Each structure stands twice: as C-alpha cells, then as structure tokens.
C-alpha cells in the first residue's frame, strides 16, 4: 500500500509537467519513445532469459506494451484536446475497468462489492471536476477511455502473470519495458513528426525525469505494490491521482479548483477505500473460504 501512495504522489507531478511543457510542443510519439526507452534502459541490466520460456517472456512484453506503450500514445495525444484537469477527470472510470478485467482474466463472476467500492471512487473523482469541459469533450473522452482500458488490461495482466507465471519483479520489468519500447519505436517510425522534437534543455530534462523516475522507477513501484493488494484496493488507489494531480496543479501552476467539490470528492474517494478495506474485501475473502470448504465437507 505504501508503494502505491508514494507512486501516486510522484505521478501527480507527471500530468502537469507533460501538459504544461510538452503537449503541443513535442511530438507525442517521440515523447512516448523517449519515456519508455529511458525506462527500459534502467532495467536493461536485469534482462534474463534463463529459466523462462518464450510464452512467459512474450506475455510480460505484451502487458508492458498495453500498460505503457499504447496507453501513453493514447493519453499523450489526448493532451491536444484536453486540459490537465479534464484529462485527470476522464481517468476516473479506470477502477471499474480494473475490477471488471481482473474478474474476466480470473474467470470469476463479477463481484458486485468490488464494483460498488470502485464506483464510489468514480463518483468521488467526478465530483472534483464536474463543472466545465471544452469543445473537444468527446474526442478527448474517447482517447482517455481507450487509454484507461489499455492501462487496466496491462496492470491486471501483470498482476495475473505474477500469480500464474511468476518471475523476479526486476526481471519481469526488464521485459515489460522492452515490450513498451518496441511498440513505441514502431509507432514513432510510422507516425512520428521529426519536426517537433524537444528544443530546450527544460523539455529534455522533463522527458528524462518522466522516463527514468516517473516511468522507470514509478511503474516498478506501482506494479510491485499492485501484487500486494487486492483488485478493489488497486482500482481505488488508481483514482487518488485525481486530487493529487489537481493539488500539484494548484500549488505550482496556481490552477484554482472549486474547493467545496474538491474536498467533497477527495473525501468520497478516501471513504471508498475505507469501505472496501473494512467491509468489501473481508466479505469477499470469507465467501472464497466458504466455497473452498464446501467441496471438502461434501466429501
């Protein structure tokens, strides 16, 4: 849980840094390429094939391509249509995607308690930024939702792989980032605009920070933390970036939120986490234990 909180704080700066200094100035495909390329370099020394078959390696590369490569390309392009605060708002459905996709991958029936606690988090994040949208609402909304789904598939896929095809986390992330880099390299070669490369030291510095720290270290901490909690807690923590990101926007770029809705929404998100950990997760665990005992007692 602590790793998820630390990463949320770290990522709160990423939204504003990209939105304020790179979006519209630097080609989004190049930004993705550099960001995941630097992250891949961080973990390149841990790339190992011994003891892991080709299918397992390919699956870790696939979840990296989904969670980072494709997700970044969609979300970075969305910055052309949305403000930072609007983009933050439109990510609030991610907890629902995480919960639903985890149940599908686990071949389980939908756990309505998990969906309920995730829905509370969605409501809380929505309260924070309900008041205004731009003319590009529908295009931005579509791009961000596709990005959210890609992120959720990758994150849940990584969690499931660690449950079914485990390998040391640092080795797994070496393949994870390599998968993301390959997707980004293909996209840049086909769609990139070489006329819109970074021109200032500040832009390059931000890209290095986003690649090495926010992506390289941040996603490792996030996905490692994801293996330590249940899917419901994971989905709710994913929505904490909304108030965190808006606070950073306020503190550094002096963007003023609507304080009553901000405080109310943040409180609802925190309440959803408390409800989930207090009631939903224990009840789900108890139900699973009961189901395991029933076949044994019938024998």
Swiss-Prot record:
Gene Ontology cellular-component terms listed: membrane; plasma membrane
Span of domain EamA: 3-128, 139-274
Key words of the record: Cell inner membrane, Cell membrane, Membrane, Repeat, Transmembrane, Transmembrane helix, Transport
Keyword Transmembrane: yes
Residues annotated as transmembrane: 2-22, 26-46, 56-76, 81-101, 110-130, 137-157, 172-192, 202-222, 233-253, 256-276
Membrane topology note: Multi-pass membrane protein
Compartment(s) of residence: Cell inner membrane
Stretches of the chain forming a coiled coil according to its record: none
Catalytic activity: biotin(in) = biotin(out)
Cysteines joined through disulfide linkages: none
Source organism, top-level taxon: Bacteria
Protein's job: Uptake of biotin.
Annotated family: Belongs to the drug/metabolite transporter (DMT) superfamily. 10 TMS drug/metabolite exporter (DME) (TC 2.A.7.3) family.
Protein name per UniProt: Biotin transporter
Naturally occurring in which organism (per UniProt): Salmonella typhimurium (strain LT2 / SGSC1412 / ATCC 700720)
